[in-house]
């Protein structure tokens, strides 16, 4: 689908250039990569892009957005907002969304997404079932949490309700306390609420792994990053990047592309290329198709990347 271009943030650019002033050795690399990326003469491999410092990655992407109006149509970032009436019918609150996920989608598939750990009706994880005994002393590792594959902060942080919740009367409690940005957006922004509670974007995860992944982007880390027992998840806090297990990459890719198309969220060209690759390499299996059908029956909208899977260019 066509997508409306989102302009670069002046604040983000100023922060990026201020960072480079403090780290002068990045200037040459940043200038070269950004310039070549702008003209489109060279597309950096996404695995190499993942290894760049986050400030440099963001600066390159923001530079592309700034010159986007000057580029040929085929190179542009374009987004089209989804009308409110076209949004999926998702749960009205977070508690209901989680309960629906566990009781109506995963009721007979009680294993976590990334690490394949078994869990019981009380959402207590059997760490021995997936080789995560090394986390036995971590209380958060013993519970299941609903993980946003497309991080909520990524589609919330540019919204006014997230940035300035104090401006909304509905975001103040009876005692005068101002709600957090996430809580405020859930109250006043229907599109955010729908995306936040969309079951297509929610997966049961070991709580500790969910917390360590935080809101990091997906990508490749080669051998750089923390690992957890027998789980193939790898996370690098300095790069703010997480490399998922091979078995989860196809589902992650199709989820990210679904969220992009359904809610108009922006993905960088590097991210899109990565997700196309993962989608092509890892087609949906029987459970992913069944999961999609169950969610479609609940929300009225399925994930077309699962339902009508095909190789992406």
Regions found by a protein language model. Name each.
Residues 2-143, 155-173, 198, 219-241, ...:
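Nuclease and nuclease-like effector domains acting on nucleic acids or nucleotide cofactors
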Residues 137-313:
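Domain-level detector of nuclease and nuclease-like folds
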């Amino acid at each position: 689908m066509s997508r409306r271009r989102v302009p670069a943030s002046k604040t983000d650019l100023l922060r990026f250039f201020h960072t480079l002033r403090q780290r002068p050795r990045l200037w040459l690399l940043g200038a070269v990569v950004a310039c070549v990326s702008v003209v489109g003469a060279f597309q950096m491999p996404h695995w190499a892009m993942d290894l760049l410092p986050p400030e440099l990655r963001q600066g390159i992407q923001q530079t592309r957005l700034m010159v986007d109006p000057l580029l040929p149509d085929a190179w542009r970032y374009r987004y089209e907002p989804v009308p409110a009436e076209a949004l999926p019918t998702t749960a009205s609150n977070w508690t209901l969304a989680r309960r629906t996920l566990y009781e109506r989608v995963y009721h007979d598939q009680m294993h976590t997404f990334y690490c394949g750990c078994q869990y019981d009706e009380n959402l207590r994880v059997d760490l021995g079932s997936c080789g995560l005994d090394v986390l036995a002393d971590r209380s958060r590792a013993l519970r299941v949490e609903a993980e946003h594959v497309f991080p909520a902060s990524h589609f919330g942080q540019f919204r006014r309700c997230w940035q300035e919740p104090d401006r909304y009367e509905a975001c103040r409690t009876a005692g005068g306390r101002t709600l957090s940005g996430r809580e405020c957006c859930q109250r006043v922004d229907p599109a955010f609420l729908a995306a936040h509670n969309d079951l297509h974007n929610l997966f049961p995860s070991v709580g500790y792994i969910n917390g360590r992944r935080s809101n990091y982007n997906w990508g490749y880390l080669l051998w750089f990053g923390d690992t957890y027992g027998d789980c193939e998840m790898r996370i690098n806090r300095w790069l703010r990047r997480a490399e998922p297990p091979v078995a989860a990459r196809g589902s992650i890719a199709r989820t990210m592309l679904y969220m992009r198309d359904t809610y108009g969220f922006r993905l960088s060209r590097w991210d899109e290329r990565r997700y196309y690759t993962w989608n092509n390499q890892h087609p949906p299996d029987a459970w992913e198709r069944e999961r999609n059908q169950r969610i479609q029956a609940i929300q009225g909208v399925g994930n077309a990347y699962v339902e009508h899977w095909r190789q992406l260019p």
